[in-house]
Amino acid sequence: IMGKDRTEFDPIVIAGGPCATFNPEPFADFIDAFIIGEGEGLVSHVLDIIRDGKLEGLDRHAILRQLADVSGVYVPSLYVPIYNEDGEFKGYDIVEGVPKTIKRHFEMLTSGGETVVATNYTEFGAMYIIEVARGCGRHCRFCMAGYCFRVPRVRPLDILKEGVERAEKLGKKVGLMGAAI
């Protein structure tokens, strides 16, 4: 169901991740709100806004309007594309009060970034994955990490050590993960 066809009884559809951050427009007609950038720190806030809005009796548009005020959230229905007569993209008709630019949300890497479900029934079942770093400063033209998540950030050593200790308690090998390691 396209976003414009959803009713008050339909869920608010949210998307995120690298593809949504890099180019959300191919999905804009189907998604109510995109989390642009890294979503771990935004998801609970976004869900709180939706829950609180529903509890207050706000309609779908009012909730989406509140989401648009969150830095790192893009609500496509509030940015209507405008085209020239020849079909060339001209710009957007932006709802008043909505940010003209959507800024990517970056995490400081102080929590999360580890295996959540530790089971042997997955591809890396014997391993406890720990994210060491995000972003990349090399800016290779072929790589999404260099453009989409440009700012290189390294998780603090004490947090990495805590992750290794959790892996040891579970009897798992440690796998280190990052875009540029």
Segments the model singles out, each with a brief description of its role:
Residues I12-V13, V43-V46, V70-V75, V80, ...:
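Extended aliphatic helical segments
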Residues I1-I94:
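Glycine-rich beta-alpha loop elements in corrinoid/cobalamin-binding modules
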